[in-house]
Amino acid sequence: MSLYYHTLANGLRLVHIMTPSRVAWCGLAVNAGSRDEASGYYGLAHFVEHTIFKGTTHRRAWHILNRMERVGGELNAYTTKEGTMLYSVFPDEHLPRAVDLLADLVQWSVFPQEELDRERDVVLEEAASYRDTPSDAVYDDFEDLLFAGSELGHNILGRKEDLERLTRDDCMRYLKTLYVPANMAFFSVGPARPERVFGLAEKAFGGMSHALAPRHRAVPTAVAPFNKVIQIGTHQAHTVVGAQVPDMKHPLRHALMLLNNILGGPGMNSLLNVELRERRGYVYTVESTLTLLSDCGWMEIYLGCDPDDVKSSLRVIDRITARLGQELLPERRLEAYKKQYCGQLVVAADSSEFMAMRAGRGLLYHGSVSTVAQTIESIQAVTPEDIARAAAYLAHDRLSSLTFQ
């Protein structure tokens, strides 16, 4: 695997990872997400992500949908709290087609009114499906509470009343303001030579203006810990417990990543799965997630269990996080945790999709892409003291919880 970088005259950053696979990926990472929406426009970032595919000055919605599909590829996108990804996967000989299509979308989308009205119904149904899925909805509501009063304190899908009044002008303004070269990064993974990739990107994106995206993000303040229970009448209780943690550039970020994996990573031998499911039979599902943004972060532990077992499960979580924050892990045990996490990274890196998304995010937020080897080196440098400092963010007096039952 070889990494290559280039920057266009208008400020668009490019990265290409050269691999021998015949399957290629390319896309745009955009530094714009739900936190960039003004009050009254919640859901706009996600709505633009949906409707950007609905027509340009050169193509109708059907032509956009069919452009990559007809050659066996896919075109897709997703929105997060502070980012949007537009990307395509395809047989490598169709790289020019994919680059040209992405450029068309971000430069020439027109958001036809009839398409907006139709897609609005689709997005409203998507939001409704989340509300019908407590294991998803509890995350959104927990984060709304954890960041109450800040630009992160509303969910990505938005509110029905806001979605219903979003206009074509709102979409155009958002696109023209935030989808600009200095606020985006182009990424590519595949067998093409870097000069070919960068040449295609120059031709497709070089004409975009050198505009700077306005940035008014405010660092969220800490909220008082809360413990809320909402009755929704389900057989199973759905609980999220967590706290705010430092941002993606903080010195403890790798310790937080490792801690998250120790607590509730994908392995069946994670601490919480062993203690709550295997030993006590309290839960059916338990998992931990870590989200690191440019100026803040949060760690969440989700558990699905019988309502009668929620309090007992929370006490176990409290004991485990307290112990990790107060007692240093033995070196031998920490090395075992590192070995597992680093092995998981190696396995994940075998995926071109993993590499592509990692490349886009890395270039957008850090200005470069960390290789898996570099990440492993950083994980290996984590000390028992680092784990204790990271776990201190999950101390009892910092933890909040939300339960649907």
List each model region and its residues.
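Polar low-complexity intrinsically disordered regions
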Residues: 2, 195, 225-227
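Active/ligand-binding-proximal structured segments within catalytic/core domains
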Residues: 11, 18-68, 179, 251-263, ...
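Short, Gly/Pro- and small/polar-rich lid/capping loops
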Residues: 1-10
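Short, conserved beta-strand segments within well-ordered enzyme catalytic domains
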Residues: 15, 27-29, 52, 76-78, ...
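Generic preference for hydrophobic
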Residues: 14-16, 28, 186, 241, ...
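His/Glu-based metal-binding/catalytic segments typifying zinc-dependent metallopeptidases
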Residues: 18-22, 27-29, 212-269
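Charge-rich, well-structured scaffold segments of protease-associated domains
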Residues: 7, 61-213, 219, 229, ...
